[in-house]
C-alpha cells in the first residue's frame, strides 16, 4: 500500500575560506615575497539512498542541515582546510524538488546511490596568486565563494510493511496510535476510520517499519460492501497482516469468533494469495476482561477460531503487550526485506581463498 510521505528541509553547503595576505620573513632577507595561501573549499552536502530507511520521519524533526565552512588561507603558502562534507541518508525512491518552484532536482532510485545536492563554495585566493612581473608585493586577496543554499521538499511513496485487518471498532486506530506517530481519529463507534492511516513505528535509531490502518471490513467487502473493498487490493503489497480482534465487544450478542471468520472469508474470496499471506492474530482489549478470566477467554477463542499461526494478547488502550509485539513485527519485516534483496554478484577474481594448511614442523 503506497502513501506519500513528505518533509521540508533547508540545506546549506559551506562557504569557501578567504585567501591570506602574507609575506615571507626570512633571516637576512628584508623584502620577502608573497606567500599567502588560498582559502579551503566549503563542505558539500550529499544525499545517499539507504535501503534500510523507509520513511522521511527523521527529517520532520531535523530541518536545517549545514556543512562546515572552509578554513582561511595562511602564510607560508598554506592553504585553508576544506570544510567537512555532510551526508544525508534518505530512503530509496526519495524525490527532491525545489520547495519554491516545484522543479524536480534529484531522484534517489538506486540503493547506495550518492548525489551532490549542494556544492561547497570555492576558497578565495591568497596574495601569492597576484604576484606578477609588475607587482612583486601584492596585497590583494579574495574572499571565499558562498556555498549553495536550497530549500527542498522531499517526497517518498511509502510502501506499508504491515496492514491492519479487523471489523469496525476492533481497536485498530487505538493500536496504531499507541505504537506509532500517527494520530487517527478515535471514537467508540464503528467506521471512525474513513481513510487509511499511516504510522511509522520506531523501534530504535534508523530502525522502523510502516503500518497501515485500513477502514474496518464488513461481511461482503470483497464484493463491494462497506468501505473496506476500496482498500483490500492495497494489502497485497504488504509484508504482514495483523488481524486485530475485539475480545470484549460492547454488544454481548456479538460473537468475536464469527466476526473473525467473516474477515478471513473476505480475504479468501478476494484473493487466494492475499489469504495465504503471513497473518498474525492480535487479541485486543484484554483490559476489558477480568484478569482471572483472560486465559480461558483466549483459549476458547483460539480453539473455536481454529487458528494455527502466531497469537498475541494486547490492550492497545493500556499498551499492555504492545512493546513485545512491535519488536517481533520488526524482526519479521527485516527478515522479509533481507530475503527480497537480490544476491550480490561476486567477481570471481576476488574470491577469498581458504588459508593454506600449516606445514608440519620439521624434526631435527
UniProtKB/Swiss-Prot annotation:
Keyword set, alphabetical order: Cytoplasm, GTP-binding, Hydrolase, Magnesium, Metal-binding, Nucleotide-binding
Primary residence: cytoplasm
Alphabetical list of InterPro entries matching this protein: G_OBG (IPR031167), GTP-bd (IPR006073), GTP-bd_Obg/CgtA (IPR014100), GTP1-OBG_CS (IPR006074), GTP1_OBG_dom (IPR006169), GTP1_OBG_dom_sf (IPR036726), OBG_GTPase (IPR045086), P-loop_NTPase (IPR027417)
Domain OBG-type G: 160-334
Domain Obg: 1-159
GO cellular component term, pick one: cytoplasm
Positions annotated to bind Mg(2+): 173, 193
GO biological process: ribosome biogenesis
Binding residues for GTP: 166-173, 191-195, 213-216, 284-287, 315-317
GO molecular function: GTP binding; GTPase activity; magnesium ion binding
Localization of this protein: Cytoplasm
Names of required cofactors: Mg(2+)
Matching Pfam families: GTP1_OBG, MMR_HSR1
EC number(s) reported in the record: 3.6.5.-
Quaternary context: Monomer.
Family named by the database record: Belongs to the TRAFAC class OBG-HflX-like GTPase superfamily. OBG GTPase family.
Function in brief: An essential GTPase which binds GTP, GDP and possibly (p)ppGpp with moderate affinity, with high nucleotide exchange rates and a fairly low GTP hydrolysis rate. Plays a role in control of the cell cycle, stress response, ribosome biogenesis and in those bacteria that undergo differentiation, in morphogenesis control.
Name assigned to this protein: GTPase Obg
